[in-house]
Swiss-Prot record:
GO biological process terms on file: L-methionine salvage from methylthioadenosine; L-methionine salvage from S-adenosylmethionine
Protein name per UniProt: Acireductone dioxygenase
UniProt enzyme class: oxidoreductase
Free-text comment on the cofactor: Binds 1 Fe(2+) cation per monomer.
Source species of the chain: Xylella fastidiosa (strain 9a5c)
Amino acid sequence: MSRLRIFDDHTPDTPFFVSKEQTQITAELHKIGITFERWEATQAIEPGATPEQVMAAYRADIDRLIATHGFKTVDVVSIAPDNPKREEMRAKFLEEHFHKEDEVRFFVAGSGLFTVHSGNKVYEIECVKNDLIAIPDGTQHWFDMGAAPYFVAIRFFTEPDGWVGHFTGTDIAQRFPRYIPEGCQSAH
């Protein structure tokens, strides 16, 4: 289940807001310019589905976003716990950074934790299957896929180079807890 926790940036162990309610999550994130939606597949996605099958299942929503936002590239990323590069991939996203384009991800399966630093607040957003998140360009954030990552996500890009992070050099991401998916154990 999706979850939003909001912290003051100096109190990483004490959220002042916690919700698993879709309408509350959407409303809180909208205040800082983040889009958060739930999508439903038009056809079943089977384990081992190809990227083409994944995109076909969500074609109407993908086309709507492309038309609305002018995305030039769409792809599918799939990470499993046995991926030999999982630690390297996790480390790449764990430091606070921003992009010069919106970061838009739709979770087809699995989960991950986006954490946004906006003003003096930190928004921890657990994204799960059927969640779409769009983080505006210039927004400082980090992403944690967990130590045993499992997710399949559709990624949208306006830049042909794909993912390009501009790191802030701050240590804020290190001060906040790491992601442990619900059901594994409590991360916080």
